[in-house]
Every structure is written in structure tokens, then in C-alpha cells.
Amino acid sequence: MEENKQRVKSMINILQLVAPGTPLREGIDNVLRAQTGGLIVLGYNEQIKSIVDGGFHINCAFSPASLYELAKMDGALILNETGSKILIANAQLVPEASIDSIETGMRHRTAERVAKQTGSLVVAISQRRNVITLYQGNLRYTLKDIGVILTKANQAIQTLEKYKAVWNDGITNLGILEFEEVVTMSEVVHVLHSVEMVLRIKNEILSYIHELGTEGRLIRLQLTELLADLEAEAALLIKDYHQEKTQDHHQILKKLQDLANTQLLEDSDLVKLLGYPGQTSLEESVTPRGYRITSKISRVPPLIIENLINRFKTLQGVCRATIHELDDVEGIGEVRAKKIREGLKRIQEHLYMSRHN
């Protein structure tokens, strides 16, 4: 899993460097439109130096126009790691011929071998096929047309909206069952599955956003709006149902996100994520601590909620508490005690109304 996370992180860094709106991408697009082809290496370490033959050391500031003009020459362009300087133009690259390559064209084969030998980012711009291919180490990625990415991103947003609706239905149903004291592990796992799918699609959309650069701002806004409060509520759901109250619920949500990136989760995986044995029956009754529901009461800060749960242990304990018992909790006076009682009643009524709408 760590290796996969590292690959994803590397890919994000690469895509941000060549995303639309960046000077480097503008220069690459100019070369692509001119159909001259090109080979660009980012980074000039000892390994790169050992395979560079000839070329002109120009060491000038990067500009899209300079890249376009210099790419007309047959050799490769060597830039610094950040792409802010053009160091060498018309360089001949001589990587180890024994390094495996799946490419057929000379330019792309050289790019792949250089990337594998040095670990540097290499950009190959096809002369005839209008394709930009990125190589770094064993990573290979072909940049897609912006229109294609936007279409895929919009489709992913629509899918996310559907799973958000599934989450809303599931969390509403769970809230009703919590007040009725009839929650089983099955309902909790069902809601966590919807969280898993939302996180999976979120990651896919983020990859599109990274590749879209400045063109992805609207998609990012839609994603932010759709996921508003969902992840925070999912973390409180975990805090409610994890077997160990002391566990860091945000860390467990992050673990769920990491798992969602790599595999489809079984019910037993989610049960184990909550600290229970994998073979735990889904029909087993479970009791919420009450963090998620009480956090919906207006003007009750997290510290007061923590005091409430420490005193009454469960959501039902809080619901059954009298005004006098609530008043005894540190930080809660008579006025706030009444607001808590009224707030819980309003939340319950809202849940029932939501189910029937």
C-alpha cells in the first residue's frame, strides 16, 4: 500500500508541473501544435550528466517561447528540476541500451530509458501522433486531451452525486435507528460502504483536477460543495462506533481512504476498521456514543460534547438525561441544558420528516 501511495504522490507532483496554465505546459503545447516533436528532461544531476553528449550550455530563464524555438533542434532540452531554467539545448542522450523499453519510436524509447536509468522526469512530445508522454522511473503516463478529461471529470461528479444521495439516505436511516436504539453492525457497515465509494470517486476526481490545472477550478468547486461536512460527519460516525473510544477517528478515516484507493472493501474489512474481529456478526447490536448527533446541536462546542459523552456514555444516555442531570455536567448551565434537550428533539423530528419526504 505504501508503494502505491508513493506512486500516486509522484504522479500528482508530475501532473501539477505540466498542468494546463503552467508555463511548461504552454511551451509543450506550442511544440505539439508545431508538430516538430521534442524531448525534455527535468533535472541535471550526476546521472543525467553521465548520459549527456554535446549540446549547448545556455543556462537561461525558462519561457514557453524559448522552449518552442529550442525544441526545433534535433537534440533534447535539459531543464532544472522545477522547470524554471533551460540549462542545455540540442543535447544528445545516450542511456544504457540494455535497459528494457516497450516503446517503438526512437524518441520515446530514449525517454523511457533515460527515466528508468536516472529517475528524472522526461517528457516526450510525439512529432506525428500529437501525444505527450511523461516518464519517471518506471512510471509512464500519456497526457489526455483537456476536453476528454473534462468529460470524464463531469461524469465522475455525476456519479459522486448519486453516491452522496446513497450516503444521505443511509445516514438519515441510521440516525432514526439510533434514536430508536435498534442499530446493528449491518447499518453502520452499509453507511461506511457509501463513505468508501464517495472517497474512491473523490480521489479519481482529484486526479482529473491535477491534470486539468487552471481548467479544473469549476470541478474543484463542485467537489468541495458536494463533500461539504461529509468527511467530518464520517469521522464522527467512526468515533461513535469504534470499539476503542480513544482511537484517533480522523486517522481511521484516512486509513479507510487509503484502503479505498487500492481495493474494494468487504464487510469484514470495515468491521475490523472499527476495532472488532472480522468474523463479528452483522446482526450484532451496537450503541452509538452520540458524538455525531450531538454535534448537530447548535452552539454546543466540541469540549462540551466531550463532557456530555464522558458523563452519559451513549446517545441514549444523553437523550434520557433530565435538565437537572445535564445542568450538572461541567460547562452546561440550565439554559444550555434546555437547548440540548430541545436540539435533540428537533434533530429527531427532522430525521423522521426526511425519511418520509
Swiss-Prot record:
Originating gene: disA
Similarity comment text for this entry: Belongs to the DisA family.
Coiled-coil annotated residue ranges, if any: none
Biological source species: Bacillus cereus (strain G9842)
GO annotation terms (biological process): DNA repair
Protein name: DNA integrity scanning protein DisA
Keyword field: ATP-binding, DNA damage, DNA repair, DNA-binding, Magnesium, Nucleotide-binding, Nucleotidyltransferase, Transferase
HAMAP family: DisA
Enzyme class: transferase
Binding site for ATP: 75, 93, 106-110
Subunit annotation: Homooctamer.
Reaction(s) this enzyme catalyzes, per UniProt: 2 ATP = 3',3'-c-di-AMP + 2 diphosphate
Any Pfam family matching the protein: DAC
Protein purpose: Participates in a DNA-damage check-point that is active prior to asymmetric division when DNA is damaged. DisA forms globular foci that rapidly scan along the chromosomes during sporulation, searching for lesions. When a lesion is present, DisA pauses at the lesion site. This triggers a cellular response that culminates in a temporary block in sporulation initiation. Also has diadenylate cyclase activity, catalyzing the condensation of 2 ATP molecules into cyclic di-AMP (c-di-AMP). c-di-AMP acts as a signaling molecule that couples DNA integrity with progression of sporulation. The rise in c-di-AMP level generated by DisA while scanning the chromosome, operates as a positive signal that advances sporulation; upon encountering a lesion, the DisA focus arrests at the damaged site and halts c-di-AMP synthesis.
